[in-house]
Amino acid sequence: MSKVSKAVVVFSGGQDSTTCLIQALNQYDEVHGITFDYGQRHSQEIEVARSLGQRLGLVSHKILDVSMLNELAISALTRDSIEVSNELMENGLPNTFVPGRNILFLTLAGIYAYQLGADSVITGVCETDFSGYPDCRNDFVKTMESALNQGMDRQCKIVTPLMWLNKAETWALADQYKSLELVRDETLTCYNGIIGNGCGTCPACLLRQSGLEDYSNNREQVQSDLASKCHK
């Protein structure tokens, strides 16, 4: 009897993590979700994730309170008093960067995977369109994977399906699974908490919209580019 393949998806209810979840549901026998409540500015994403998780068929969906991150990490995403800016800070990072967020999220997802006996943790981080976040880079992910495997004496792979895709190719991936409309209309990527097309002005909305326009205008080429990356 073959082993049941299990994965834990770090799931925020946004475009990237929803696309990763949909792909995982087509690739694994059991898919579990983990969502984090850290007092984020766009807190509506938690309910969006809960609703989408139920609709798409997660085997289990754990929503964790990690509000201590909000106390420690000062960012436009953790403080309503700080306006989201399209300009970089003096340190070269966006003011939406939450220090340690993916370190914490991947650690907790790794622990959850350990308890479930899952061999994969899936996250939608991306180095191509990473918005300047250092904890979305491939080197960081590989280092985290090594640390978790050594610390728990168990092999668990951190899978990053979007790592080398641009935003247009991420839209193409959703379309490949016949889920472009769902991702476009029902996910929450906007830093100002507006579902679907969002506010249209925050960095997350601008990146999402430019990718969708690129895909809509160059569908065949983007699909071809996606296919070449997926088969490397």
Curated annotation (Swiss-Prot):
Reactions this protein catalyses: 7-carboxy-7-deazaguanine + NH4(+) + ATP = 7-cyano-7-deazaguanine + ADP + phosphate + H2O + H(+)
Amino acids binding Zn(2+): 190, 199, 202, 205
GO biological process, one term: queuosine biosynthetic process
UniProt KW Ligase keyword: yes
InterPro entries: QueC, Rossmann-like_a/b/a_fold
Cofactor note: Binds 1 zinc ion per subunit.
Organism of origin: Shewanella sediminis (strain HAW-EB3)
Family affiliation: Belongs to the QueC family.
Keywords, comma-separated and alphabetical: ATP-binding, Ligase, Metal-binding, Nucleotide-binding, Queuosine biosynthesis, Zinc
Gene3D superfamilies assigned: HUPs
EC number: 6.3.4.20
Cofactor section: Zn(2+)
Protein name: 7-cyano-7-deazaguanine synthase
HAMAP family: QueC (MF_01633)
GO MF, one annotated term: ligase activity, forming carbon-nitrogen bonds
SUPFAM superfamilies listed in its UniProt record: Adenine nucleotide alpha hydrolases-like (SSF52402)
Pfam families xref list: QueC
Function: Catalyzes the ATP-dependent conversion of 7-carboxy-7-deazaguanine (CDG) to 7-cyano-7-deazaguanine (preQ(0)).
Pathway(s) per entry: Purine metabolism; 7-cyano-7-deazaguanine biosynthesis
Residues noted as binding ATP in the record, renumbered to the chain: 11-21
